[in-house]
C-alpha cells in the first residue's frame, strides 16, 4: 500500500480527531512534533558542521513546533537563534518562549539580511506556516520568506515549506526550496513536489486505529527512532 499524502481537509480532520477522540493535548503533540524535527535536523545536518541555526517561527502551531525544536537542538549541541516576528499571546506559546529564554537561547528582533544570515548561521529552520496556511504571505512575514527564497544556506522546513500551497505546492519558481522537509503526522499533498535531498516523517504518535481509518499507510519507524526517512 502506498503512503497517503493528505489534502488540507484531511490534515485538519486527523489533527482534530487526535484532540477530540484520542484526548491528546496541543502541547503534548507539539512537544513530540518539535522533538522529532530536532532529531531529523541532527540526522541531516550534524552539529559539528551546522552548529548555528536561525529558527524562524510563525504565529501558529508550526511556530510552536519551531520553539520546541530550538530547545531540543540547544541540548544537542547546536546554537539556535530564534526569529519570532509575531509571538502568539497564548499561555502555551508564552511558556515555550520562556523555556527557550531560560535555556539561554537568544532571539533577534529584526529579520537578518541575506548577507547577515550567511555570516552568522549555518542552517535555517523554517517553522513559519503549517497546513492551515492560505496565500498570500502576510506583511509581518514577507521579509523572512524573502530571506529564505534568496539565501544559499540550507533550509529545513517543518511540515510545509513556507509560502507553498498545502495541496499544490510551489506557486512560483522563486518559492522556498528546502534541503530537508520534515512532514509531521503524515505528509501533505505539497510534499509530492519536494525535490530536496532529505524527506523525513516525524510525529510518532498516530494511533494504529487512526492510521487505519484514514488509510495513511505510514512507514514503520525503525527501533526507537522519532523520525523515519521517506
From Swiss-Prot:
E.C. number(s) listed in UniProt: 5.1.99.6
Source organism, top-level taxon: Eukaryota
InterPro entries noted in UniProt: YjeF_N_dom (IPR004443), YjeF_N_dom_sf (IPR036652), YJEFN_prot_NAXE-like (IPR032976)
Binding residue positions for (6S)-NADPHX: 61-65, 130-136, 159
Disulfide bonds, paired cysteine numbers: none
One Pfam family cited in the UniProt record for this chain: YjeF_N
Coiled coil spans: none
GO molecular function, one term: nucleotide binding
GO cellular component, one term: mitochondrion
Keywords of this entry: Isomerase, Metal-binding, NAD, NADP, Nucleotide-binding, Potassium
Binding site for K(+): 62, 126, 162
Cofactor binding, note field: Binds 1 potassium ion per subunit.
Catalytic activity, as annotated: (6R)-NADHX = (6S)-NADHX; (6R)-NADPHX = (6S)-NADPHX
Cofactor(s) this protein cannot do without: K(+)
Domain YjeF N-terminal residues, every copy: 11-218
Enzyme class name: isomerase
PROSITE patterns reported in the protein's UniProt record: YJEF_N
NCBIfam families: yjeF_nterm
Protein family per UniProt: Belongs to the NnrE/AIBP family.
Free-text function comment from the UniProt entry: Catalyzes the epimerization of the S- and R-forms of NAD(P)HX, a damaged form of NAD(P)H that is a result of enzymatic or heat-dependent hydration. This is a prerequisite for the S-specific NAD(P)H-hydrate dehydratase to allow the repair of both epimers of NAD(P)HX.
Name of the molecule in the record: NAD(P)H-hydrate epimerase
Species annotation: Drosophila erecta
